């Protein structure tokens, strides 16, 4: 009987460590607001470009997935605008974390968009997670990496479903 309780406790701990809890959501929204709020609109392009620079440094082949938006010229208006569009998509998802039904619909929509793009794989979202995990502590004080990782995984797993 004790073994059963130990097993249940371990399962609960494992589940909690991968769940984007209400506390995690609050931390992520606070961290995100510190980086992406309207008060910081002048640095949005730089933040988005930094994420993509980190992505491409981790997976150079991923740059080819963005050839249609001039990824070979990261300072082009076309690519900078795309970077901001991607991060704005994350902004929308983060702001839906407290409304799971709406978030699920949004993630399904984004998933369909990514499924339609040749070459995009679920593994790319792991690399994108690493890129954000590198950049976010630089732009958000008191950054909570554990909360960020759990909630980003919730979003990324929803978008990469079906890839």
Curated annotation (Swiss-Prot):
- A Pfam family for this UniProt protein? Globin
SUPFAM superfamilies recorded: Globin-like
Note the Gene3D superfamilies from the entry.
Globins
Query: Binding residues for heme b, per the UniProt record?
Result: 114
* The keyword Membrane appears for this protein: no
Q: Which residues form the Globin domain?
A: 19-163
Binding positions for hydrogen sulfide per the UniProt entry: 83
Q: Give GO MF terms, alphabetically.
A: heme binding; iron ion binding; oxygen binding; oxygen carrier activity
Q: What is its main location?
A: secreted
Q: How does it assemble?
A: The 400 kDa hemoglobin consists of a spherical 24-mer arranged as a double layer of dome-shaped dodecamers. Each dodecamer is composed of the 3-fold trimer of the tetramer A1-A2-B1-B2 having one intra-tetramer (A1-B2) disulfide bond and one inter-tetramer (B1-B2) disulfide bond per tetramer.
The family annotation for this protein states: Belongs to the globin family.
State what this protein does: The extracellular giant hemoglobin is able to bind and transport oxygen and hydrosulfide simultaneously and reversibly at two different sites.
Its recorded name reads Extracellular giant hemoglobin major globin subunit B2
The scientific name of the source species is Oligobrachia mashikoi
Q: What is the lineage of its organism?
A: Eukaryota, Metazoa, Spiralia, Lophotrochozoa, Annelida
């Amino acid at each position: 009987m004790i073994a059963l309780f130990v097993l249940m406790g371990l399962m609960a701990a494992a589940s909690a460590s991968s769940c984007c809890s209400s506390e995690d959501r609050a931390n992520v929204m606070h961290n995100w607001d510190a980086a992406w709020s309207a008060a910081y609109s002048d640095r949005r392009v730089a933040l988005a470009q930094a994420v993509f620079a980190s992505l491409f440094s981790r997976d150079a082949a991923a740059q080819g997935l963005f050839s249609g938006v001039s990824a070979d010229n990261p300072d082009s208006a076309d690519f900078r605008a795309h970077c901001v569009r991607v991060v704005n998509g994350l902004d929308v998802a983060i702001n839906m974390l407290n409304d799971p039904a709406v978030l699920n619909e949004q993630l399904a929509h984004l998933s369909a968009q990514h499924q339609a793009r040749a070459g995009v794989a679920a593994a790319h979202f792991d690399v994108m997670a690493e890129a954000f995990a590198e950049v976010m502590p630089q732009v958000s004080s008191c950054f909570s990496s554990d909360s960020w990782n759990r909630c980003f995984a919730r979003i990324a797993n929803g978008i990469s479903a079906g890839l």
